[in-house]
């Protein structure tokens, strides 16, 4: 048994929702005759999602959603199980794009996207794919933002379900998943102490909240930078310090970006960093930390540790960048905890099944996943934990419906 198969077997023990879905639908096989194209961080948990979809009858074609997040041993294990895989860990963007194209060559009926690349390419460079494409399920904040922008231009041609905007996704995956996995990656790759350090978190959305929460739990002094005044007030009320980035970088031991935006640090911010400061990105794309600026102002670049690049700046200070500025928890770690992704991937499967049943009456726009599916996943999770909750009485239901 290779390491990839061992990893998949391990996660399968801790994904009760996917196991339950496979048990419920494997005889009916509702996806029989349909192709699901996936662009997703290819590691053990996503591999198990692909396997579960295949148990529901789908032909699954999968590639990575980030050049550095594919785990080659897992990709090989998936191939051995009959899944079509076009992916390998690479620093070459052209190979990454080539693999996206290969997935689209299979003319998928449904796309499960992570960041929106497959969907955007199918609407721009590969429009023939749209003839067969029935709908898209998008996993990430970044991807949903891109596809809503596509919708606003009037160019979106298929219905999209924003799985990211489901409560059972963002309240758990974005917050607890990102919080734990980001710090797991930072600590395993630097071996540095967090307690007593100044941690700057750029962006206080659900991902930023999780990163800040776990940093505080590790004993750090947490500083949040924001452009949204409401989120800034939230961060203050949660007990964190808020200040502009240009001030925060002067005292930062760690800077972690989670804004979903570009160029979160300026050249001046980088030059103001302390000697030995560590930079990590928890956003989907490698645009939040301006690596090109680091390259321009560095007089020396060197590998300090695996996944850690040192840059000696023109002012004599050295700063360290993790995972080339890519998504640190996946490019330099194993991603979110297994049980968290069990929730998100249950939502993904139900999104595909919803599209299968309803795509003909859906317009080409971005939809929320229906509340009843969110609630179904929540109840499945409670059942897997053996937890019971109260139910409203009929009197209570009448009271909530009344206006007098």
Curated annotation (Swiss-Prot):
Subcellular location: Cytoplasm
Domain of life: Bacteria
List of residues binding NAD(+): 140-142, 174, 203-208, 226, 261, 282-284, 329
Gene3D superfamilies, per database record: Adenosylhomocysteinase-like, NAD(P)-binding Rossmann-like Domain
Family matches, as SUPFAM superfamilies: Formate/glycerate dehydrogenase catalytic domain-like, NAD(P)-binding Rossmann-fold domains
Binding-site residues for substrate, renumbered to this chain: 114, 139, 169, 173
GO biological process terms held by the UniProt record: L-homocysteine biosynthetic process; one-carbon metabolic process; S-adenosylmethionine cycle
GO cellular component: cytosol
Keyword Cytoplasm: yes
Cofactor annotation comment: Binds 1 NAD(+) per subunit.
PROSITE patterns: ADOHCYASE_1, ADOHCYASE_2
EC number: 3.13.2.1
InterPro entries in the cross-refs: Adenosylhomocyst_ase-like_sf, Adenosylhomocysteinase-like, Ado_hCys_hydrolase_NAD-bd, NAD(P)-bd_dom_sf, S-Ado-L-homoCys_hydrolase_CS
A single MF term (Gene Ontology): adenosylhomocysteinase activity
One family name in Pfam for this protein: AdoHcyase
Keywords assigned: Cytoplasm, Hydrolase, NAD, One-carbon metabolism
Catalytic class of the enzyme: hydrolase
Alphabetized SMART domains for the sequence: AdoHcyase, AdoHcyase_NAD
Catalytic reaction list: S-adenosyl-L-homocysteine + H2O = L-homocysteine + adenosine
Predominant cellular place of this UniProt entry's protein: cytoplasm
Reported cofactor(s): NAD(+)
Coiled-coil positions: none
Family membership noted in the UniProt record: Belongs to the adenosylhomocysteinase family.
Function: May play a key role in the regulation of the intracellular concentration of adenosylhomocysteine.
PANTHER family named in the record: ADENOSYLHOMOCYSTEINASE
Protein name: Adenosylhomocysteinase
């Amino acid at each position: 048994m290779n390491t990839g198969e061992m990893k998949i077997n391990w996660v399968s023990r801790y994904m009760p929702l996917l196991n339950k879905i496979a048990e419920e639908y494997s005889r009916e096989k509702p996806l029989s005759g349909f192709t699901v194209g996936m662009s997703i961080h290819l590691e053990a948990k996503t591999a198990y999602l692909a396997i579960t979809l295949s148990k529901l009858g789908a032909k699954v074609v999968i590639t990575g959603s980030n050049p550095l997040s594919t785990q080659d041993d897992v990709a090989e294990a998936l191939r051995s199980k009959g899944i079509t895989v076009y992916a390998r860990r690479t620093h070459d963007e052209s190979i990454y794009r080539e693999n996206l194209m290969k997935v689209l060559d299979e003319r998928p009926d449904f796309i499960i996207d992570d960041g929106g690349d497959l969907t955007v390419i199918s609407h721009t460079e590969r429009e023939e794919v749209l003839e067969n494409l029935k709908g898209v399920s998008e996993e990430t904040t970044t991807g949903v933002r891109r596809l809503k922008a596509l919708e606003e231009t009037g160019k979106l041609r298929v219905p999209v379900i924003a799985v990211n905007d489901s409560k059972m996704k963002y309240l758990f995956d974005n917050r607890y998943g990102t919080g734990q996995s980001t710090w797991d990656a930072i600590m395993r790759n630097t071996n540095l102490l967090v307690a007593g350090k100044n941690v700057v978190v750029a962006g206080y959305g659900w991902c930023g909240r999780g990163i800040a929460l776990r940093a505080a739990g590790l004993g750090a002094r947490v500083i949040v930078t924001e452009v949204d005044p409401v989120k800034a007030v939230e961060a203050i009320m949660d007990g964190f310090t808020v200040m502009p980035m240009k001030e925060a970088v002067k005292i930062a031991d760690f800077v972690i970006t989670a804004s979903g935006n570009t160029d979160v640090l300026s050249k001046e911010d980088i030059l103001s960093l302390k000697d030995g400061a560590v930079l990590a990105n928890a956003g989907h794309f490698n645009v939040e930390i301006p690596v090109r600026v680091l390259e321009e102002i560095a007089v020396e670049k060197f590998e300090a540790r695996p996944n850690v690049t040192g840059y000696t700046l023109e002012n004599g200070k050295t700063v360290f960048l993790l995972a080339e500025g890519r998504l640190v928890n996946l490019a330099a770690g194993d991603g979110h905890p297994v049980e968290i992704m069990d929730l998100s991937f249950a939502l993904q499967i139900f999104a595909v099944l919803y599209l299968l049943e309803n795509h003909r009456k859906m317009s080409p726009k971005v939809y929320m996943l229906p509340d009843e599916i969110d609630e179904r996943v929540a109840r499945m999770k409670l059942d897997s934990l053996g937890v019971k909750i109260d139910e409203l009485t009929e009197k209570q239901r009448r009271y909530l419906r009344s206006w007098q």
